[in-house]
Swiss-Prot record:
It catalyses: Hydrolysis of alpha-(2->3)-, alpha-(2->6)-, alpha-(2->8)- glycosidic linkages of terminal sialic acid residues in oligosaccharides, glycoproteins, glycolipids, colominic acid and synthetic substrates. This is Neuraminidase. It comes from Influenza A virus (strain A/Equine/Cor/16/1974 H7N7). Its cofactor is Ca(2+). It is an enzyme of class 3 (hydrolase). InterPro entries: Glyco_hydro_34, Sialidase_sf. The keyword Cytoplasm does not apply. GO terms for molecular function: exo-alpha-sialidase activity; metal ion binding.
């Protein structure tokens, strides 16, 4: 075949292919037009439109059927604000729900040095919160961690029952004093940082900085070292500024979404307030605090969360629960501190004032931070002559204890009442064990109430401190 024949043959093939493509295109166009026309004729028969409003999390499904429009709205409820509508459960004994054994693990693991731990819950779980020292136990920076206030401290949270490590701890905020609570929707946290005479409290809501509070007495602004409490979107916090051994200046501060909505200076007969352990019930908040100036009996603050008002006084019983403390008294005081030697300085503690089911916690030793016991004292909050009815040992007196405080899982739907819970800090190292180590840290145990009587047992820290030498 000569070149001209090849050219004509190729052109013929190209023309045939082009015609075939054209016919295919025409048939496709006809099919699309037909389908579109059928779709248009039935378009209004059954159309579903879904609108999601992210703010209110409301889904609206609109069904169009011929000429009738039917709206069906389904509200997807966010967890609502916590309402303190229940009373405290009756308790017949206490059971351990968590023990992290942090110091025992710390002999070989990289456990973070902490103090001032506490427990706080949200709708999903309960966690431990603690103020770290910016180091681990086996790190040389752990030397001299007896100091309460340094620039290296900050609040962390860890799963309850797990010792705090770098990998399992979540950073919350910088500071050397703290409180934190959940309002049912988001968590509010306060940390105090800076110089003793010029400190600042930072307030966070949903992990975002919302406001700050500057010292008002220029003498170690400080707060609870345990959880605050919220009701109907308002969270209440007790803060103190001023001397630890003289008249100080305490405020009860109310927050909404991390913003201050009201402040009250301390009212009532309490002479000195520090490190309150608070719990909610019956639309009220009760705080059991520390009088570091005079009283071996604990002051209490009672807060009406509807009126946003408070008053203060002392636990009435003559059974004293601060450390150091003199011997128990036959008759207590409701409106004045009970003094005596040994007295100051005091320790953070707690109690659950529930009429004839009242329980108070204290160290077993009246002088040292050792041992821990729970005492059932009916009507201790109101009766100066109330006496110990039951006693449960938590930590034997030959083991170190420390701070203690209250917490409640307000979102436990298995109960029609709030089950009281508490934790005990188990301090190890300096100052009591200074001949072995240069650091101060702690482990933690947490306990909750049982509706029936329980057995016995002691739950100390359990670490052999000489292994760290």
């Amino acid at each position: 075949m000569n070149p001209n024949q090849k050219l004509f043959a190729s052109s013929g093939i190209a023309i045939v292919l082009g015609i075939i493509n054209l016919l295919i295109g025409i048939s496709n166009m006809s099919l699309n037009i037909s389908l579109y026309s059928k779709g248009e004729s039935h378009k209004n028969n059954n159309l579903t439109c879904t609108n999601i409003n992210q703010n209110d999390t409301t889904m609206v499904n609109t069904y169009i059927n011929n000429a009738t429009i039917i709206d069906k709205s389904t509200k997807i409820e966010n967890p609502g604000y916590l309402l303190l509508n229940k009373s405290l459960c009756n308790v017949e004994g206490w059971v351990v729900i968590a023990k992290d054994n942090a110091i025992r693990f710390g002999e070989s693991e990289q456990i973070i040095v902490t103090r001032e731990p506490y427990v706080s819950c949200d709708p999903l779980s309960c966690k431990m919160y603690a103020l770290h020292q910016g180091t681990t136990i086996r790190n040389k920076h752990s030397n001299s961690t007896t100091h309460d206030r340094t620039a290296f401290r900050g609040l962390i949270s860890t799963p309850l029952g797990s010792p705090p490590t770098v990998s399992n701890s979540e950073f919350i905020c910088v500071g050397w004093s703290s409180t934190s609570c959940h309002d049912g929707v988001n968590r509010m946290t306060i940390c105090v940082q800076g110089d003793n005479e010029n400190a600042t409290a930072t307030v966070y809501y949903n992990k975002r900085l919302t406001t700050t509070i500057k010292t008002w007495a220029k003498n170690i602004l400080r707060t609870q070292e345990s959880e605050c409490v919220c009701h109907n979107s308002t969270c209440v916090v007790v803060m103190t500024d001023g001397p630890a051994n003289n008249q100080a200046f305490t405020k009860v501060i109310y927050f909404h979404k991390g913003m201050i909505i009201k402040e009250e200076s301390l009212k009532g007969s309490a002479k000195h307030i520090e490190e309150c352990s608070c719990y909610g019930h019956n639309q009220r908040v009760t705080c059991v605090c520390r009088d570091n100036w005079q009283g071996a009996n604990r002051p209490i603050i009672e807060i009406d969360m509807n009126k946003l008002e408070h008053t203060s006084r002392y636990i009435c019983t003559g059974v004293l629960t601060d450390t150091s403390r003199p011997k128990d008294k036959t008759i207590g005081e409701c409106f004045n501190p009970i003094t005596g030697s040994p007295g100051a300085p005091g320790i953070k503690g707690f109690g659950f004032l529930n009429e004839d089911n009242t329980w108070l916690g204290r160290t077993i030793s009246p002088r040292l931070r050792s041992g821990f016991e729970m005492l059932k004292i009916p009507n201790a909050g109101t009766d100066p002559e109330s006496k110990i009815k039951e006693r449960q040992e938590i930590v034997s007196n030959d083991n170190w204890s420390g701070y203690s405080g209250s917490f409640i899982d307000y979102w436990n739907d298995n109960s029609e009442c709030y089950n009281p819970c508490f934790y005990v800090e188990l301090i190890r190292g300096r100052p009591e064990e200074a001949k072995y180590v240069e650091w101060t840290s702690n482990s933690l145990i947490a306990l909750c109430g049982s509706p029936i009587s329980v057995g016995s047992g002691s739950f100390p820290d359990g670490a052999q401190i000489k292994y760290f030498s």
